[in-house]
Amino acid sequence: MSDNNTSERKPLILIAEDVESNYKLLEIILKKEYDLLWAKNGKEAVEYAFAEHPDAVLMDIKMPVMDGIETLKEIRLRTTELPVIMQTAYAFDTDRRTAEEAGCNGFITKPVMPRELKMYLDKYLK
């Protein structure tokens, strides 16, 4: 007899975001389809990336303690397998180039559009 109560684990998304209201918006968009872990700065994000083994990271560029680019570089020193999608309210071409050079998998601008965000996550999680 099969157990109908078993379900697949939802993918775990690490959200590195220092502004609580921005995290709450992402939570509203993502919580039905994903388990979420919140890092409030880059240092926490690096710690959680290797302690909690998320399936993907959604990372703000402008954060205290360690910014998103430095955090991405730290993650990339240890793995290139973890998908990292950078997000910023400052959509400068230099930010995009710097993030790509550091090894990000995608780049989205704030305010985040739910369809665009889910498209990126689906691309790297399926």
Where are these regions (language model features)?
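Acidic catalytic/metal-coordinating carboxylates
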Residues: 18, 41-44, 67-73
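Two-component/phosphorelay signaling modules centered on CheY-like receiver
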Residues: 19-37
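Acidic, metal-coordinating helix/loop segments flanking the phosphotransfer/catalytic sites
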Residues: 38-56, 77
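Receiver (REC) domain active-site loop signature in two-component systems and cognate sites
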Residues: 63
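As written
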Residues: 68, 100-105
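C-terminal output helix
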Residues: 112-121
